[in-house]
Structures are given as structure tokens and as C-alpha cells.
Swiss-Prot record:
Residues 8-118 form the MTTase N-terminal domain. Catalyzes the methylthiolation of an aspartic acid residue of ribosomal protein uS12. SUPFAM superfamilies: Radical SAM enzymes. This is Ribosomal protein uS12 methylthiotransferase RimO. [4Fe-4S] cluster 1 binds at C17, C53, C82. It is an enzyme of class 2 (transferase). Its EC number is 2.8.4.4. Residues 376-441 form the TRAM domain. Pfam families: Radical_SAM (PF04055), TRAM_2 (PF18693), UPF0004 (PF00919). It is found in: Cytoplasm. One of its GO terms (biological process) is tRNA modification. NCBIfam families: 30S ribosomal protein S12 methylthiotransferase RimO, MiaB/RimO family radical SAM methylthiotransferase. The gene is rimO. It comes from Shigella sonnei (strain Ss046).
Length: 441
């Protein structure tokens, strides 16, 4: 009787943003297709892959620590991802790393794995990989990456130097992936990229094909097509181009979720110019007003940076004034920190850490108040909620206004007869600064 050769085992660590998560899913899918077993522990693995983040200093530190832990626990480590674009920095701290590749270098990663842990003799029918691929998210939602890279040159950001200029995926390929996800039971698709609203710019919005039908390569056409799948579609990382106005009617018609994640970064024209970001705050406020008139249910999420080099109290006050007027629903705020390779590092008048901290606290205090007031308006109303978790105490879900992991939650105490992915109608009974509580209707 022939001896069964055990499958080679690969440990995997995925750090950073959802875009990195999608890269990890692609590598894992290829490994599983080739017959490798992916395991959760280092000591049981023949090798470990660490997919790193290198966007800000804290992310770099986390990545370096993860590499160090993998080396200590296992010894055979391949590094990929954004920090991989800075090989010298990794080698200086961890010279024993076997191989280093940059972001979206899937083929290189697989070649390195084949070199150190040869490909098994694999019968694909013994270990079927799901058609939608290996996913690191719960079964009921998934990220759909539509492009790679970015054409902007924001002075605080090094993404273009790590991931290159914008490269849009063919729209037929994107829509086919979306269909596979829905067929596999996904109820919510989160559209991501470095710059979602620029989708198709690099190919001059050429016409592609899906199911034999012509489809324009653009964000608006993509949203129109995704709306036909009968699931929740959520847009992330939307740069405030003029054509963003065109997706708001789709939200008002219920074709995609009335949710827009649009990083604005600041509200002082002077600071925005230093950041190389769009600078007309009055125009942005007018657009927000218009969007809400067209789609009253619209949820606006944004992120901002406080303590950017040379930011004065007057600049910061402009930001607070903008918050008061815009009354955004979901807001993240970061204290500026220098990122190696970013142009902003060379700007004069760096803001002291204690000033950054004080401004961040004032910013968050104001936004918490706004968020609490916005959520209080929902008390007594009925909303749709998608369930994420269920235990003996009840269920936790999200409304259309909440993206996974970054926004709030809806708590349904005592509601145990549901499962993740169920979409319920819920009456809101209570709210705080970030979350809602309610009961099933």
C-alpha cells in the first residue's frame, strides 16, 4: 500500500488594511489550489508568509514585530506586502528572512514558496477550494478589490511608491468575481481600492464585457451592475471627484447602500494645499448638502489628520467649524506622524506631540457629540440590520450605515434565533455615541 505524503504546511500572517487582506486571500487561494495546507500556528508550519503593512510608523513596527515572532517561532519566513517595498529596512532588523517581495507580487511569493517548500503532488479533488477562493472574512461579507495603485501624490502618503500608479481590473473580471461571491452566499460586498472613484481612468473608461454585454469601466457602471446582484454594495475609499455625484441617485433608488466613505483629510485650504488634496471646503459643503437632499438616508464616513506640519490653531479651528457644519456620521481621526519617504517630512514647522494630542482630543470630543446626536435621530425608527454574530445573550449586527470593523454596531439583546448573514427589520430603542440597540420587528 502506498504511503500517503503529508501536505506541506504554510503559516500565514496578514496585517494592514482590507486591500492587503484581499492580497492575502489571493495568495492563500493559490496555495490551497496547489495542495498546500494553510495552518494557524508557526511551530506546525514548514514555512511562514508575513503580508506586511508599511503605511505609518506604528504599522511598520507591528510588521517588524510579526516578522520577528515568525522567525523566532519557525525560522523560515517570506515577507511580502507594502513594507516589502523597503527591503533594506527589513534586512537591517531581520537579516535571516529568506525572501522579500513588494505588494501584489503574488507570482513571486509562490515561486519562493515552491523553492523552499516544493509543490506537493496534489489531487485537487481531495481538497476542493471553494469557487470564490479562500476568504479571511466571515461568509456573509467580502471585499471586492477593483484596482491597484493610485495616481495621486498626497504629501503624507507613500502608497504610490509602494503600489505604483492606478491599474484598474477589467470590469468583466470584477463582475464575475462578484457573481461568484454572491453564489457562495455573500450578502454584502465592500468595494475597495486605493482610489475607488478613479476606477477606469487609466484605461480611459474603455468598454469591457460581462455575460456578453458591453459595460463601461467606471465606478458608476460598476455600481449599476452590482445592484443587479440583489446584495448590499458598500463603497470605500472614494476620492471626491465631481462624478461621485452620479452615484448618489443610485443610493437614493436603493441600488447600492446609501453609504459613502470619502477621506477628506482636512478643511483648511492652506493645509489641504500642503497635503496636495482638493481645497475648496465651501464646494464640498455644498455637495454634501446636495447629496443629502437627493438621498436623505445617506451615511457619510470620512477620515482626517490633525497636527499636520505647520497646522496653526486657526487651521485647526477651520476643521472644527467644518465638522460642525458638515455633521458627518462616521469619522476617524489620526494624529500626523512622519512616514519614511513621504514628502510631508520635509515641510517646516512640525507640530509638537502634546499639541497634536490636545487637538485630537478636542476633535474627537466634538465628533462624538455630533455622532451621538445623529444616532439619537434613529431612535424609534425601523432599520435593516445584517447579523454578524450570535451567542446565548443575543445578536450583534450592523445597519446600512455601518461597515465591518470600522463603524458602529446594532445590539439585539435576547435575539438568538438568527444566524450570521440574516438581514432583519429592527426597531431602534436606544443609541449612544457609536452604537444602537433595538429589537426585531
Amino acid at each position: 500500500m502506498s504511503k500517503v505524503t503529508p501536505q506541506p504546511k504554510i503559516g500565514f500572517v496578514s496585517l494592514g488594511c482590507p486591500k492587503n487582506l484581499v492580497d492575502s486571500e489571493r495568495i492563500l487561494t493559490e496555495l490551497r489550489t496547489e495542495g498546500y495546507d494553510v495552518v494557524p500556528s508557526y511551530d506546525d508550519a514548514d514555512m511562514v508568509i508575513v503580508n506586511t503593512c508599511g503605511f505609518i510608523d506604528s504599522a511598520v513596527q507591528e510588521s517588524l514585530e510579526a516578522i520577528g515572532e515568525a522567525l523566532n517561532e519557525n525560522g523560515k519566513v517570506i515577507v511580502t506586502g507594502c513594507l516589502g517595498a523597503k527591503e533594506d529596512q527589513i534586512r537591517e532588523v531581520h537579516p535571516k528572512v529568506l525572501e522579500i517581495t513588494g505588494p501584489h507580487s503574488y507570482e513571486q511569493v509562490l515561486e519562493h514558496v515552491h523553492h523552499y517548500v516544493p509543490k506537493p503532488k496534489h489531487n485537487p479533488f481531495l481538497s476542493l477550494v471553494p469557487e470564490q477562493g479562500v476568504k479571511l472574512t466571515p461568509r456573509h461579507y467580502a471585499y471586492l478589490k477593483i484596482s491597484e495603485g493610485c495616481n495621486h501624490r498626497c504629501t503624507f502618503c507613500i502608497i504610490p511608491s509602494m503600489r505604483g500608479d492606478l491599474v484598474s481590473r477589467p470590469i468583466g473580471e470584477v463582475l464575475s468575481e462578484a457573481k461568484r461571491l454572491v453564489d457562495a452566499g455573500v450578502k454584502e460586498i465592500l468595494v475597495i481600492s486605493q482610489d475607488t472613484s478613479a476606477y477606469g481612468v487609466d484605461v480611459k473608461h474603455r468598454t469591457g464585457f460581462h455575460n456578453g454585454e458591453p459595460v463601461k469601466t467606471s465606478m458608476v457602471s460598476l455600481c449599476e451592475q452590482l445592484s443587479k446582484l440583489g446584495i448590499w454594495t458598500r463603497l470605500h475609499y472614494v476620492y471626491p471627484y465631481p462624478h461621485v455625484d452620479d452615484v448618489i441617485p443610485l443610493m437614493a433608488e436603493g441600488k447600492i447602500l446609501p453609504y459613502l466613505d470619502i477621506p477628506l483629510q482636512h478643511a483648511s485650504p492652506r493645509i489641504l494645499k500642503l497635503m496636495k488634496r482638493p481645497g475648496s471646503v465651501d464646494r464640498q459643503l455644498a455637495r454634501i448638502k446636495q447629496w443629502r437632499e437627493i438621498c436623505p438616508e445617506l451615511t457619510l464616513r470620512s477620515t482626517f489628520i490633525v497636527g499636520f506640519p505647520s497646522e496653526t490653531e486657526e487651521d485647526f479651528q477651520m476643521l472644527l467649524d467644518f465638522l460642525k457644519e458638515a455633521r458627518l456620521d462616521r469619522v476617524g481621526c489620526f494624529k500626523y506622524s512622519p512616514v519614511e519617504g513621504a514628502d510631508a517630512n520635509a515641510l517646516p514647522d512640525q507640530v509638537p506631540e502634546e499639541v497634536k494630542e490636545e487637538r485630537w482630543n478636542r476633535f474627537m470630543q466634538l465628533q462624538q457629540q455630533i455622532s451621538a446626536e445623529r444616532l439619537q435621530e434613529k431612535v424609534g425608527r425601523e432599520i435593516l440590520v445584517i447579523i454578524d454574530e450570535v451567542d446565548e445573550e443575543g445578536a450583534i449586527g450592523r445597519s446600512m450605515a455601518d461597515a465591518p470593523e470600522i463603524d458602529g454596531a446594532v445590539y439585539l439583546n435576547g435575539e438568538t434565533n438568527v444566524k450570521p448573514g440574516d438581514i432583519l427589520r429592527v426597531k431602534v430603542e436606544h443609541a449612544d455615541e457609536y452604537d444602537l440597540w433595538g429589537s426585531r420587528v
